[in-house]
Amino acid sequence: SGIAAGAGQAQTLLWQAQVEDLLAQDTLLQTEVFGPLSLLVEVDDEAQLKAVVKALQGQLTATLHAEADDGPLAASLLPLLCEKAGRVLFNGYPTGVEVCDAMVHGGPWPATTDARGTSVGSRAIERFLRPVCLQNAPAALLPPALQDANPLNLLRLVNGQWTREAISSPH
Protein backbone atom coordinates (compact mmCIF):
# COMPACT_ATOMS: atom_id res chain seq x y z
CA SER A 1 0.00 0.00 0.00
CA GLY A 2 1.08 3.58 -0.32
CA ILE A 3 0.01 7.19 -0.53
CA ALA A 4 0.50 8.83 -3.89
CA ALA A 5 3.41 11.25 -3.90
CA GLY A 6 3.02 14.89 -4.76
CA ALA A 7 5.45 16.79 -6.96
CA GLY A 8 8.99 16.49 -5.55
CA GLN A 9 7.93 13.97 -2.90
CA ALA A 10 8.54 10.26 -2.42
CA GLN A 11 5.64 7.86 -2.19
CA THR A 12 5.13 6.41 1.28
CA LEU A 13 5.01 2.64 1.49
CA LEU A 14 3.90 0.15 4.13
CA TRP A 15 4.96 -3.44 3.57
CA GLN A 16 3.98 -6.49 5.58
CA ALA A 17 6.13 -9.60 5.88
CA GLN A 18 5.78 -12.96 7.54
CA VAL A 19 8.04 -13.43 10.55
CA GLU A 20 9.24 -16.75 9.13
CA ASP A 21 10.58 -15.00 6.00
CA LEU A 22 12.51 -12.46 8.04
CA LEU A 23 13.94 -15.14 10.32
CA ALA A 24 15.01 -17.12 7.23
CA GLN A 25 17.19 -14.14 6.18
CA ASP A 26 15.12 -13.27 3.08
CA THR A 27 17.45 -10.97 1.12
CA LEU A 28 14.69 -8.58 0.04
CA LEU A 29 13.65 -8.08 3.65
CA GLN A 30 17.28 -7.59 4.72
CA THR A 31 18.01 -4.86 2.16
CA GLU A 32 18.22 -1.40 3.71
CA VAL A 33 15.81 1.06 2.10
CA PHE A 34 16.14 4.83 2.17
CA GLY A 35 12.90 6.79 2.09
CA PRO A 36 9.40 6.67 3.57
CA LEU A 37 8.96 2.91 3.95
CA SER A 38 7.87 0.84 6.93
CA LEU A 39 7.99 -2.93 7.18
CA LEU A 40 5.38 -4.48 9.46
CA VAL A 41 6.23 -7.87 10.96
CA GLU A 42 3.74 -9.30 13.44
CA VAL A 43 5.24 -11.49 16.15
CA ASP A 44 3.60 -13.90 18.58
CA ASP A 45 5.52 -13.00 21.72
CA GLU A 46 8.57 -11.30 23.23
CA ALA A 47 10.86 -14.23 22.39
CA GLN A 48 9.91 -14.05 18.72
CA LEU A 49 10.38 -10.27 18.73
CA LYS A 50 13.91 -10.69 20.08
CA ALA A 51 14.61 -13.36 17.46
CA VAL A 52 13.52 -10.93 14.74
CA VAL A 53 15.81 -8.18 16.08
CA LYS A 54 18.72 -10.64 16.27
CA ALA A 55 18.06 -11.69 12.65
CA LEU A 56 18.39 -8.13 11.34
CA GLN A 57 21.55 -7.05 9.57
CA GLY A 58 23.40 -3.86 10.50
CA GLN A 59 21.47 -0.61 10.08
CA LEU A 60 22.25 3.08 10.31
CA THR A 61 19.35 3.55 12.73
CA ALA A 62 16.78 1.63 14.73
CA THR A 63 13.71 3.17 16.33
CA LEU A 64 11.91 1.88 19.41
CA HIS A 65 8.35 3.16 19.83
CA ALA A 66 7.31 2.42 23.40
CA GLU A 67 5.25 3.77 26.27
CA ALA A 68 6.24 4.11 29.92
CA ASP A 69 4.77 0.74 30.90
CA ASP A 70 6.86 -0.92 28.16
CA GLY A 71 9.98 -0.21 30.23
CA PRO A 72 11.05 -3.82 30.95
CA LEU A 73 10.57 -4.88 27.33
CA ALA A 74 12.35 -1.76 26.06
CA ALA A 75 15.23 -2.43 28.46
CA SER A 76 15.60 -5.98 27.16
CA LEU A 77 15.48 -4.84 23.51
CA LEU A 78 17.96 -1.97 23.87
CA PRO A 79 21.17 -4.07 23.97
CA LEU A 80 19.99 -6.01 20.91
CA LEU A 81 19.20 -2.81 19.01
CA CYS A 82 22.59 -1.34 19.97
CA GLU A 83 24.25 -4.35 18.30
CA LYS A 84 22.29 -3.72 15.09
CA ALA A 85 22.40 0.06 14.64
CA GLY A 86 24.73 3.02 14.99
CA ARG A 87 21.95 5.23 16.34
CA VAL A 88 18.93 4.07 18.37
CA LEU A 89 16.00 6.47 18.55
CA PHE A 90 13.18 6.43 21.07
CA ASN A 91 9.70 7.47 19.93
CA GLY A 92 11.14 9.51 17.09
CA TYR A 93 12.11 9.39 13.46
CA PRO A 94 15.63 9.37 11.98
CA THR A 95 14.91 12.01 9.36
CA GLY A 96 17.02 14.76 10.92
CA VAL A 97 20.75 14.22 11.31
CA GLU A 98 22.29 17.00 13.39
CA VAL A 99 25.89 17.85 12.59
CA CYS A 100 27.42 17.79 16.07
CA ASP A 101 30.20 16.11 18.02
CA ALA A 102 27.92 13.42 19.47
CA MET A 103 26.22 12.38 16.22
CA VAL A 104 26.80 8.87 14.94
CA HIS A 105 25.60 8.22 11.41
CA GLY A 106 27.00 4.78 10.80
CA GLY A 107 26.43 1.29 12.05
CA PRO A 108 27.44 -2.33 11.76
CA TRP A 109 27.93 -3.94 8.36
CA PRO A 110 26.24 -3.73 5.86
CA ALA A 111 25.08 -0.25 6.92
CA THR A 112 28.75 0.81 6.83
CA THR A 113 32.01 -0.92 6.11
CA ASP A 114 33.61 0.37 9.33
CA ALA A 115 31.28 0.75 12.31
CA ARG A 116 33.83 2.80 14.27
CA GLY A 117 33.24 5.91 12.16
CA THR A 118 30.45 8.27 11.21
CA SER A 119 29.62 10.11 8.00
CA VAL A 120 28.23 13.16 9.83
CA GLY A 121 29.64 15.46 12.50
CA SER A 122 33.10 16.47 13.60
CA ARG A 123 34.37 12.87 13.68
CA ALA A 124 33.44 12.24 10.03
CA ILE A 125 37.00 13.07 8.91
CA GLU A 126 38.12 9.83 10.56
CA ARG A 127 36.55 7.91 7.65
CA PHE A 128 39.42 9.13 5.49
CA LEU A 129 42.20 8.26 7.94
CA ARG A 130 44.03 5.02 8.53
CA PRO A 131 46.91 4.22 10.83
CA VAL A 132 50.39 3.62 9.42
CA CYS A 133 53.41 2.56 11.46
CA LEU A 134 56.85 3.83 10.45
CA GLN A 135 58.98 1.29 12.27
CA ASN A 136 62.71 2.07 12.55
CA ALA A 137 62.33 4.93 10.05
CA PRO A 138 65.31 7.30 9.84
CA ALA A 139 64.61 10.53 11.73
CA ALA A 140 65.19 12.58 8.57
CA LEU A 141 62.26 10.83 6.87
CA LEU A 142 59.71 11.31 9.65
CA PRO A 143 56.95 13.91 9.19
CA PRO A 144 57.02 16.81 11.71
CA ALA A 145 54.21 15.25 13.80
CA LEU A 146 56.40 12.21 14.46
CA GLN A 147 59.78 13.87 14.93
CA ASP A 148 61.35 13.49 18.38
CA ALA A 149 61.70 17.30 18.68
CA ASN A 150 57.90 17.73 18.27
CA PRO A 151 58.23 20.97 16.24
CA LEU A 152 54.42 21.24 15.97
CA ASN A 153 54.01 21.09 19.78
CA LEU A 154 51.40 18.33 19.45
CA LEU A 155 49.96 16.48 22.41
CA ARG A 156 51.29 12.94 21.89
CA LEU A 157 51.10 9.64 23.72
CA VAL A 158 54.69 8.57 24.42
CA ASN A 159 55.34 5.43 26.46
CA GLY A 160 51.84 5.59 27.93
CA GLN A 161 52.07 9.28 28.94
CA TRP A 162 50.45 12.29 27.23
CA THR A 163 53.06 14.98 26.61
CA ARG A 164 54.06 17.89 24.38
CA GLU A 165 57.70 17.49 25.35
CA ALA A 166 60.40 16.46 22.91
CA ILE A 167 61.52 12.87 23.11
CA SER A 168 65.11 12.57 24.22
CA SER A 169 67.16 10.14 22.21
CA PRO A 170 68.29 7.04 24.15
CA HIS A 171 71.75 7.27 22.54
Predicted features by range, described:
Residues 1-60:
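NAD(P)-dependent aldehyde/semialdehyde dehydrogenase
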Residues 3-14, 59, 63-171:
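C-terminal segments
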